[in-house]
A protein has these predicted regions:
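Short, charge-rich, low-complexity alpha-helical interaction segments
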Residues: 1-11
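C-terminal alpha-helical interaction modules of replication/initiation AAA+ assemblies
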Residues: 9-12, 23, 39-262
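Short helix-capping and inter-helix turn/linker motifs at the boundaries of alpha-helical repeat units
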Residues: 16-21
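Amphipathic alpha-helical repeat scaffolds
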Residues: 26-31
């Protein structure tokens, strides 16, 4: 089933439709998307799309994760857009939907601040709850694979306090006015609702292990920075013929140790 992201596949020995090594192509699209290389990203995405459901599944996993981790606050509404695009894709299976997501990811500014916030919060949370994690499975608790553990995590004031501290530190050197932090008082009362919305939105699609938490962090950072999230859905059009170039395998994509395809 396409929307089951839990795959145990050794991509190293799998070839695409036109006999490219799958692991290499996933490395290429990871790194080309991050560098904004649109044509090569589209060429790789089309090859993966044409190669079947398993490849499409992994491609969507990468698009969603890169949007959350690498684009992040660079285009805050894009995470919601890619998620809704994925839902449209499950009904339409049109490459145009992937095309738009790739185009927007390539054209967006990249900002890993939210990913750093998430890592900081997770480390702080684990450090301050050692007794709990000695009795529980750390992987289950952090992966958010059960609603109970994830909601327990989201209810902790430690999360919003850590975000407040981290955001304040990051922005203090960028001429942000002190009055902007007055919005934090409002965030304290509404953040849980909006994080749960993000969590519910991603429950259906089973993204990577940190993506649900990342969605929550993106929403919090958005409220703190007074950014209005774009919840618009992707438009679906008819497939158009595309004259894409041949796939180029850059040297940096062959550094599989830096690859995050999993």
């Amino acid at each position: 089933m396409l929307n089951d992201f839990k795959q145990d596949i050794d991509w190293k020995n799998i070839q695409t439709k036109n006999n490219y090594n799958a692991r290499v192509l996933f490395s290429v699209i990871n790194k080309e998307l991050r560098r904004g290389q649109l044509l090569n990203s589209l060429a790789v995405a089309k090859e993966l799309f044409d190669s079947g459901e398993q490849f499409q599944n992994k491609l969507w996993q990468r698009l969603i994760t890169i949007t959350a981790e690498d684009v992040g606050l660079g285009n805050l509404g894009l995470y919601s857009y890619v998620c809704s695009s994925y839902e449209h894709f499950l009904k339409d299976y049109s490459f145009n939907i992937i095309y738009e997501c790739v185009r927007l990811i390539c054209g967006s500014k990249k900002n890993r601040f939210a990913d750093e916030v998430l890592n900081f919060v997770l480390l702080k949370y684990v450090a301050s709850n050692r007794d709990y994690f000695n009795e529980s499975s750390k992987d289950v608790a952090l992966n958010g694979e059960t609603r109970e553990h994830l909601q327990d995590f989201l209810k902790t004031r430690d999360l919003i306090n850590s975000v407040k501290c981290f955001v304040s530190l990051a922005m203090s050197g960028n001429n942000f006015e002190e009055t902007a932090w007055g919005a934090l008082e409002d965030v304290m009362t509404v953040w849980e609702t909006h994080i749960k919305q993000a969590y519910q939105m991603t429950l259906r699609m089973k993204p990577g292990k940190n993506d649900r938490l990342m969605a929550g962090v993106l929403h919090i950072c958005g409220f703190v920075m007074d950014i209005v999230l774009d919840e618009s859905e992707a438009s679906v059009g008819n497939d158009k013929p595309m004259d894409l170039p041949r796939i180029f395998i850059p040297a940096h994509a062959l550094d599989l140790h830096a690859n995050t395809t999993g």
